């Protein structure tokens, strides 16, 4: 919709999307924490409280989906034989290797996918293991860790929102390159942090880098994709990101294990992925 109607605002729209997503996550987290805290004060067990948080999360999904179901207008023309055409298209993709064909034909998009895979390894590791690192390396307690998670989400929302406007002004590639430098600075700060104050700086940088890089990457996909192939391009992009969500944390864990539980070296290893991403983008 944005590509067709307002191509000059792709970054802004992407930034709004990611920023509001983080805000929604904060609201959901706040509701869950309130339920858990209240339940514990009344002597309820954690099993029932955890189940309640799942129900809350599902309810939030339902509520925020209602505007889409009720008011968003479908612009695509309905196809009489839509299901049959979908099955045919899927069979052709499998038989002809359309994904490989797209990556070979659209060189810039191929480099972006590789770049996204590398930097998302770092994003996935931060999301998955930030609390573990804070507890094991920096000695954070439960309260400090919860505050850190909230802070990272807030700065991620700010980063996504702000960089959305910035990338429309300076260009999507340059904006993404700047976010990767921000990631490298974050890792260097976190790995060298000896005090809580320095680690809080790293946490803020992580949030800014996380929101801005996700916003910039998605906008750049929209720039490279032909209008009639947007869904397919985003499918390839998301496939690379989900793969990196597995590889990143596994790499962190493997380095931690091989170095005798040295998580500082493990997080430095994650920075190598950001360097490779920056190199690929260049």
Region locations from a protein language model:
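Helix-to-loop junctions at the C-terminal end of transmembrane segments
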Residues: 159-171
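Conserved small/polar residues in nucleotide/adenosyl-binding loops
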Residues: 1-5, 273-280
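Structural signature of the two symmetry-related core transmembrane helices
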Residues: 174-188
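Juxtamembrane intracellular "pre-TM" segments in multi-pass secondary transporters
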Residues: 75-113
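Helix-loop junctions at membrane interfaces in 12-TM secondary transporters
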Residues: 191-202
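Short amphipathic helix-loop junctions that connect adjacent transmembrane helices
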Residues: 128-144
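Intracellular juxtamembrane helix-capping segments at the cytosolic ends
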Residues: 4, 213-225
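A membrane-interface helix-boundary motif in multi-pass transporters
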Residues: 36-58, 254-272
């Amino acid at each position: 919709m944005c590509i067709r109607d307002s191509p000059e605002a792709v970054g802004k729209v992407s930034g709004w999307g990611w920023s509001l997503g983080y805000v929604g996550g904060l609201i959901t987290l706040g509701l869950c924490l309130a339920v858990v805290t209240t339940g514990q004060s009344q002597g309820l067990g954690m099993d029932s409280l955890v189940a309640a948080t799942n129900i809350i999360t599902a309810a939030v999904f339902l509520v925020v989906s209602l505007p889409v179901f009720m008011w968003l207008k479908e612009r695509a023309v309905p196809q009489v034989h839509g299901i049959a055409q979908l099955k045919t298209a899927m069979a052709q993709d499998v038989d002809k290797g359309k994904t490989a064909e797209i990556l070979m034909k659209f060189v810039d998009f191929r480099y972006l996918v590789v770049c996204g895979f590398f930097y998302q390894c770092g994003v996935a590791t931060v999301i998955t293991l930030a609390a573990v690192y804070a507890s094991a390396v920096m000695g954070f307690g439960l309260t400090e860790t919860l505050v850190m998670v909230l802070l990272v989400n807030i700065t991620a929302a700010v980063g996504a929102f702000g960089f959305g406007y910035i990338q429309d002004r300076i260009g999507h590639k340059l904006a993404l390159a700047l976010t990767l430098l921000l990631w490298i600075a974050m890792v260097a700060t976190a790995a060298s942090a000896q005090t809580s104050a320095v680690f809080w700086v790293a946490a803020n940088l992580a949030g800014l880098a996380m929101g801005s890089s996700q916003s910039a990457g998605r906008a750049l996909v929209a720039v490279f994709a032909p209008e009639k192939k947007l869904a397919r391009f985003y499918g390839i992009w998301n496939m690379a990101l989900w793969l990196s969500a597995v590889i990143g944390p596994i790499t962190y864990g493997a380095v931690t294990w091989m170095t005798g539980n040295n998580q500082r070296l493990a997080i430095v290893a994650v920075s190598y992925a950001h360097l490779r991403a920056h190199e690929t983008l260049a």
